[in-house]
Every structure is written in C-alpha cells, then in structure tokens.
Amino acid sequence: WGASLRTAAWACAHRVDSYRFTADREALKKSLPILESNARFIMSWFEDDGEGRYLSGPGVSPETGFYAPDGTGPNVLSYVSNGASHDQLLGRESLRNYIYACGELGVQTPTLLKAVQFLRKIPQPAIGPDGRVQEWKQTFEEMQKGHRHISHLYGLFPGTEWDILNTPEYAEAVRKSADFRRKYADMGNNGIRTGWSTAWLINLYAALGDGNAAEDRMYTMLRHYINSNLFDIHPPFQIDGNFGFSSGVAECLIQSRIMQDGFQVILLAPALADGWKKGSATGLRTRGGLKVDLSWQNGRVQATATATRPGKFRFMHQGRKKDLSMNKGAPARREFPP
C-alpha cells in the first residue's frame, strides 16, 4: 500500500456518491475543495507515455505483484509499474467526479478546464488475450492466481466506469476475471482468505446480474469468514466485510449505478438467485433519490417507488423497461412482467 497513492481518490468517490443519493448541495459544496485538490494531484502524478496517453506511475496493484523480465532474468517477481489498472480507473473517476461536481454547482475553474482535457488522455485498462481485465498495462503473470485483492475490477464495483448496459465488453472481462480469482481461491492458491474480499466478489457478481454466483460467495463468507457473533473476520474483525455483505444483498435486489439517455436506471431484482423464489424488501434507497418497496414471487416483480426529489428514471427488469418522470412525493407502482 505504500506505493498506492490512489486511496484519497477512493475516499473522494464516496463524497460524490453520497450526493447522488441525497442531492445535498451544501455537502457537495464543502467537498469541492477536496475534490479539486485530488484532481490536481492526479494530474500532477500522471505522465505522458510518449504516445499522448497519461499513465500513473510508479504505482502498484495493492498488495500483489507480477512476474516480469528484467536484467537479472526472465521471470522476476516485481510490484511497481506504470499504468496499473487500479490507478488508471481511480484517476479517471477522480476527474469525472470533479467535473460532475462542478457541473452540479455551476462552478468554472482553470482546474476544471484542464481536467476535461486531461481525462480524454487517460486510457482505460486493457482486456488481455484471455479475455480478462489486465491488472497491469502489460500482460504480466500475476503473483497469486487467487489473490484476495481484485483492485483492477474497481471499474465495475464500487466504481461506475463499467456496467452491463453501456460497456458489455468490460462487464464480460470482469466476469472472466472474477471467475478466475474465485476458481483459484477455492483451490487454495494463496487466495481469497478474507471476508472483505469475498464480500467484494458478492457485489461484483450482483453488478453482473449473476445471482447464483453472488449467493455462492455469500455462503462461502458465512461458512468461513463470519464469527458466531456475526463479525466479519480477516482473521481479525474487519467491519468492511459486514458492510460489503449487506451491500451485496441490496445490490442483488436493486441497483442504481447506471445512467442511460439522461435517465437514472433503476434495475429491479437484477440478481436473484434461483433459490430466491419469493421475498420482499422495504425502504431501499437509490441514486436519484428514490425510496423503493420491492416484492417478488415466481418471476414476477412488483415495486412501489417514491421520489424525494424530481427526476427521470428508467425502471428495468430482465430487459423490459419503463421510463418515468417523477415529482417529489409522488409514488409510482410498477410490475414486471407488465
């Protein structure tokens, strides 16, 4: 972690995501100096690679390494490189979030103008020859095939760079990457032996719409990484595993991470496991300011959504969609199939 300088960027992302739920302009206004400082740091750290692209470096993919040739041999264990996918994703997100915040607040600054230009030159992570998201700019072999850190998949969750609707090619690459990690972790390849990492996989599979895989990781977590008092273990207690598990369950029931055609997309019951034939949840909150009560039974989904502020929403379930413009306090009831 000593060479991972994007932790502040991750913290800044929470400030902007909170605004997407609450629309608290005063909180966003207070956060703007922090978001601007982070954006300026990103632009000072990333450097031109000689081909007009900006890469972060030196940096790491947290806590894991790769085998690469150097002057001493063909396969030397290394950690530091330029353009690690985790850094690239957080750099892009930092600038996008700063630009978004300025737009919401009606602010124009020299930093904003520079960020707009700079963002265009930060490349996405590559998809490797095997179809997985590359963890580093080059196609290196990872140190541990089942490693607990899956930082290069940040773009799907908790980030919003990728999703199943707008970037299906990256969603599929994330699926292959997650399946690869899960396979080798289950084989005992120095793998995912922590609750928080298992919880991250739950959320990734939920974002991919794979309820069965998400449920599989839930049971793995309950069997191996939850104490009798329900504390998540690393083996020491780590509350991010508990929060991550709860988040994963919620993401299986409702998601609001995607924008499409100017609509806030609300995915209803996007990742129900086959065994979840019947159920309900109340008081679910979404980006865009909805409060949703949800129930499902044998493939039919019913939702009642109440807006806390005006907005445009696209309700979706299994490919079907309904667009609505909603006013504050006005409940809307939707059922799929209609």
Task: Put a short name on every predicted segment.
Residues G59-V60, A115-R120, A269-W276:
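A glycine-rich phosphate-binding loop feature that marks nucleotide/adenosyl-phosphate handling sites
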Residues G65-S81, R182-I192, R257-K277:
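Intrinsically disordered, low-complexity coil segments
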Residues W10, L55-G57, K291-S295:
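Structured core elements
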Residues G2, F46-D48, N82, G146-R148, ...:
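A general structural signal for short secondary-structure junctions and capping/turn motifs
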Residues N212-P338:
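Non-catalytic C-terminal accessory modules of carbohydrate-active enzymes
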Residues W1-P33, A84-D261:
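Active-site core of glycosidic bond-cleaving carbohydrate-active enzymes
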Residues S37-A101:
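Acidic/histidine-rich catalytic neighborhood
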